[in-house]
Amino acid sequence: MLNEIQQDAQSRMNKSVASLKNAFSKIRANRAHSSLLEQIHVDYYGSMVPLSQVANISVEDSRTFKVSPWEKDMVAVIEKAIMTSNLGLNPQTMGQIMRIPLPPLTQERRGELVKIVKDEAEQAKVAIRNIRRDANSDFKELLKEKEISRDGARKAENSIQKITDTYIKEIEAKFCEKENSLLEI
């Protein structure tokens, strides 16, 4: 019973960290990475679909994307979606191919991105702590129903605390790594 609660908590904590990594991948550093454009949705005949489902996205060099729509009609729609995506990108259309240069990050924009990254990391830490709280309340419930002893509950709570500390340290490491990549000139 205790192991099941601990495994469930650890699994949920893993998902929180994976979600944080996903959120960080969508925040651009100074290099072109296709995940930056994956969050853009395009109006495809009345329904919103991810850009990757209507065009081929590739990285031409460290500062340029190349987008090749699969249909000629989609060029203008994709261009509009990229410009309104609030990523500060301006596509240059040449026939059916779009090249999207990444503008250099200003110091002000870097500061804004660091704040966003810090907020994401803080939300992940809160999620980890909430998972710990849920597990501890499950242990207390088992103690109340006399299914485990006080010592067993205390050991389980200490074990969950160690797991929580490990995940919090991992989140802090990911935050520092992302912050350094954003502040790198």
Curated annotation (Swiss-Prot):
GO terms for biological process: cytoplasmic translational termination. Its main location: cytoplasm. GO terms for cellular component: cytosol. It is found in: Cytoplasm. SUPFAM superfamilies: Ribosome recycling factor, RRF. InterPro entries: Ribosome_recyc_fac, Ribosome_recyc_fac_dom, RRF_sf. The keyword Cytoplasm applies. Keywords: Cytoplasm, Protein biosynthesis. Pfam families: RRF. GO terms for molecular function: ribosomal large subunit binding. Coiled coil: none annotated. Belongs to the RRF family. Responsible for the release of ribosomes from messenger RNA at the termination of protein biosynthesis. May increase the efficiency of translation by recycling ribosomes from one round of translation to another. This is Ribosome-recycling factor.
